[in-house]
């Protein structure tokens, strides 16, 4: 009998299906940072909060005023897990105290120095900053996929870095040739 290796979704986008009722994930686009036999981790990339980088810097280094440009850099709600922890997706090249290189020429940094670098004008110009992440236990994301909770879309750095946050979900769906407004809110199997 032929052994089939599991199909993992690392470095792909997850598009929440219209029937997704979990408010943490309804109408979201999630970048899958890791997916293996032990579970999965992703970052929701289309939910900007009312917080900006200026607000975060006020907490991290209150002795220094945040540069004006930091008021324009959105902080996204990356998911419901560890919502006080920051994650920054950015193109590979620069490394910080805690940087992991991911496929496709992007990196994930989790140390404060990446935020200071962005604020001070010498960090990665292209970035998505989130607080929190989405986490799935072993087999949980696989089960949600089998239940038609998500569509997958191949990663496109333009969607991550060049498309406005609020347009990313539709941009990923268009990449698949889909209009999410035309998909039924009822799920099923044929």
Swiss-Prot record:
Domain of life: Bacteria
Disulfide linkage: none
Segments forming a coiled coil: none
SUPFAM superfamilies recorded: VC0467-like
GO cellular component: cytosol
PANTHER family (UniProt xref): UNCHARACTERIZED PROTEIN YQGE, UPF0301 PROTEIN YQGE
The family this protein is said to belong to: Belongs to the UPF0301 (AlgH) family.
Protein name: UPF0301 protein PSPPH_0476
Upper classification of the organism: Bacteria, Pseudomonadati, Pseudomonadota, Gammaproteobacteria, Pseudomonadales
């Amino acid at each position: 009998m032929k052994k089939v290796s599991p199909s993992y979704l690392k470095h792909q986008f997850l598009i929440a299906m219209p029937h997704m009722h979990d408010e943490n994930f309804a109408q979201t686009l999630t970048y899958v940072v890791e997916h293996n036999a032990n579970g999965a981790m992703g970052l929701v990339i289309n939910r900007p909060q009312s917080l900006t980088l200026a607000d975060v810097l006020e907490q991290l280094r209150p002795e220094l005023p945040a540069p004006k440009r930091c008021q324009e850099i959105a902080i996204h709600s990356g998911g419901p897990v560890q919502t006080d922890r920051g994650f920054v997706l950015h193109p590979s090249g620069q490394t910080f105290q805690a940087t992991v290189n991911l496929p496709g020429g992007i990196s994930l940094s989790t140390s404060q120095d990446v935020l200071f670098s962005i604020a001070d004008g010498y960090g990665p110009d292209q970035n998505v900053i989130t607080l929190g992440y989405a986490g799935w236990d072993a087999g949980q994301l696989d089960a949600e996929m089998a239940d038609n909770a998500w569509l997958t879309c191949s990663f496109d750095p333009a969607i991550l870095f060049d498309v406005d946050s609020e347009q990313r979900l539709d941009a990923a769906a268009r990449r698949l040739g889909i209009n999410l407004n035309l998909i039924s809110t009822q799920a099923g199997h044929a």
